[in-house]
Each structure stands twice: as structure tokens, then as C-alpha cells.
Amino acid sequence: MNFYQISRITAGIGIIFLMLAACQQPSEECLSIAFTGDVLLDRGVRQQIRRKGVEHLFESVTPLFRSVDATVINLECPITSVRSPLHKKYIFRAEPIWATALSQAGITHAAMANNHTIDQGRNGLTDTNQYLLSSGITPVGYGDTSSQSCRPVLIKKGKIEVVLYNSVALPLENWVYLENSPGICQQPIEELKEEITNFKRQNP
């Protein structure tokens, strides 16, 4: 297996893309993955969507996303019609009808373990998972229990395999951690590093 540990991808102005290409040998088949920074569909972006449509947001990057084997975004908002905001400073929400546009743009995976997919509470979080799945997008860093939320996601092409981990290390404002309820992965970095090491050892 080929493994890549991605610690942080930081977006400044605009979006920064990280491209990974995993190859058995230079002349053999490759697995290419694009990673983006935050994808937020609220605030000023919501106004742009109202004016030009959600598809317009991805026009310039859709060819790239569709040219690789997988595209992983950091989804920086819940996708839900639920309006049950947590008591926190910044609250975001995306409309469910926009989820399909993400898939049509070539997005295949969405990292959910961050400080904003929880903005509309646990119901909004579970909605997000369902809307992603129904649009053909694989959630990463989410599960029906705390242990399930930290399970890695496999991306495979032929004999090439890449495993994705997604965990949030930031303190989550007014979010209640419940071990046996739907949630996002909140595994400390040192534990995550140890798990990756063990996984690599068990899957050489």
C-alpha cells in the first residue's frame, strides 16, 4: 500500500490545491488525488450562488477535478435545511439542493471533521452525511459513533491504495462529545499518528 499523512492544508487567498500521485513504478498506473482547502457555501459565497448559480463556483476547477481519480474537499459548512444553530460566534449552512453540484464538479470525498459541519447541531450533521452520500460523495471523518467517525477511508485504483484520515484538533465551541451518537472524529494528533503507524505496520 501507499500511504500519505496529510497534517494540514492551509488555504490563504483563494484555494490551494495539493496533488498526490501514487505509482507502483514510474511507468505503471498512477492514482491521482486533488485536495482542496475549505469549501464554504455561505456568507458572501451564498450571495454569489444566488446571483450566478452554484455551478458557477466550480467552473474553473471542474476540469481539474474531473481529470483526477479523486478530489477531496474540506466541507466547511453543514448541508441541511435544519436551522438549529449551536451557540457559537460563526454559524454556517448550505442548502441541500447544492449537494449535487459538488458531485457534478468532480468532488468525490468530503472531510467532515472540522469546526463548522457541526454548526446546525447533530441533526444538521447527520443531514450532511446523508446529502453527501445521496450525491455520490464519500464523507470522511464522520460516523454514527465516535469510533466509526475515525475510521479511515480507502481510495483504490487497481493495485494502488491510499487511505484517508480526517480528525479535528481544534476545540469545538459548545459541541457535546457523545461516544455512542453521530459525530465527527476528534482524535488527538498523537493518537492519530499512532493509529496510522499501526495501520501501516499491519498493512505493509
PLM segments and residue spans:
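Intrinsic low-complexity/disordered segments
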Residues: 2, 21-22
